[in-house]
Amino acid sequence: MDDPREGVVLLDVPPGADGEFDRAALERMGHPVHMCHGPPLGTVCPLLDERGCPLFSQAHGIVFQLDLRRSHHQAILRRYQELARRDVPIRVVVSPTDAERYADLLRDVEVWTHEPTAADLDGFAARVEAADRVRDEDQ
């Protein structure tokens, strides 16, 4: 990729999780990865308090693995859906139970009810690349 910001993926993983498999797979496919563990306890995500988030603003795709049982994580996902360009693929990793419980919130994103496999991440990377190509052609 010519532009180092091209194809950047934002990987949201729970605090304590390293997301190394996802990061390594996406980087092997040519996508720089920015990791976010969500806001530290007692703080507000900059996306929710209108400061904006540089990790989000550079993202050409988002893999969201934060805990939807936490209201501020739900708010972050809603904010992604509100602010992301229509062509930015968003994938959410949840349990089958949470997929049902939060079906309304997850309606406009693709849901993985298992840990992403290399094939899942490859398909996601292809969507990011396709969106980048279309965006480049439109400019």
Pin down the residues of each PLM region.
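A general marker of short, structured functional hotspots
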Residues: I76, D98, H114-E115, D120
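Glycine-rich, charge-decorated loop segments at or immediately adjacent to ligand/cofactor-binding or catalytic sites
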Residues: P96-E110
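Non-catalytic signal-transmission and effector/linker regions of two-component phosphorelay proteins
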Residues: M1-H31, C36-S57, Q81-L83, E110, ...
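A structural micro-motif
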Residues: H31, V88-P89
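Hydrophobic/aromatic residues positioned on beta-strands within the core alpha/beta folds
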Residues: R91-S95
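Conserved phosphotransfer microenvironments
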Residues: G42-R86, T97-R101
